[in-house]
Amino acid sequence: MAQTDVLNVTGNKIGTVELKDSIFNIEPNYDVMFRYVDMQLANRRAGTAKAKTRSEVSGGGRKPWPQKHTGRARTGSIRNPLWRHGGVIHGPKPKDWSKKLNKKMKKLALKSALSLRFKEGNLVVVDDIKLDRPKTKQMREIVKNLGLSDAKKVLFILPWKRDEYENVKLSGRNIPGVKVIIADNPGNLVNGRSSNIDGLNVFDILNHEKIVFTVDLVRKIEEVLG
């Protein structure tokens, strides 16, 4: 099994944790990761864009002017797509952009993303992170203590106990390049809801340079993906 150091919020090493090779040390499958991210971004789309066609624009029931003897170009309706405020030709219509991926591929994509970051040395494990109240200054200190100040993007993924970690999430909102997400309940990691951007997901893992986990979350990930 692979090993990595466990740090506390002051940046001191307090032990080590073993990581399952089958989850954190596999050969990354870039094709499956692409498919997962493609699905995730597609599922974000509302698909509500809509433009009115000639038949849907209001007005235009009568001919604007006679066909002949005006010296003007002939036209039959103010709803003509060539007119300002007229209908739209081939405009967008409401559409379901959502995509699906089977559970096996979702698991492989998550394992691949985690393994990629671990092999790069960009996976940081802490014992726990908790704050009594939202405080950006304290969160900045934690980022600095963990040696992550120089990273362009840092992702904190915390356990699904939202009430316990809500202050940490709020404290990280105003720090540029820092994002804090509360992971889904482990049972939801590979179902449809795991593609939500506010849960453990491949897009955020790949989109951030450094990833910070708690020991509890590592164990739950191994339990579900193992």
Curated annotation (Swiss-Prot):
It holds the Pfam family Ribosomal_L4. Gene3D superfamilies: 3.40.1370.10. Coiled coil: none annotated. SUPFAM superfamilies: Ribosomal protein L4 (SSF52166). GO terms for molecular function: rRNA binding; structural constituent of ribosome. GO terms for cellular component: ribonucleoprotein complex; ribosome. Residues 47-74 are annotated as: Disordered. GO terms for biological process: translation. Keywords: Ribonucleoprotein, Ribosomal protein, RNA-binding, rRNA-binding. Part of the 50S ribosomal subunit. Belongs to the universal ribosomal protein uL4 family. One of the primary rRNA binding proteins, this protein initially binds near the 5'-end of the 23S rRNA. It is important during the early stages of 50S assembly. It makes multiple contacts with different domains of the 23S rRNA in the assembled 50S subunit and ribosome. This is Large ribosomal subunit protein uL4. It comes from Kosmotoga olearia (strain ATCC BAA-1733 / DSM 21960 / TBF 19.5.1). The lineage of its organism: Bacteria, Thermotogati, Thermotogota, Thermotogae, Kosmotogales. The gene is rplD.
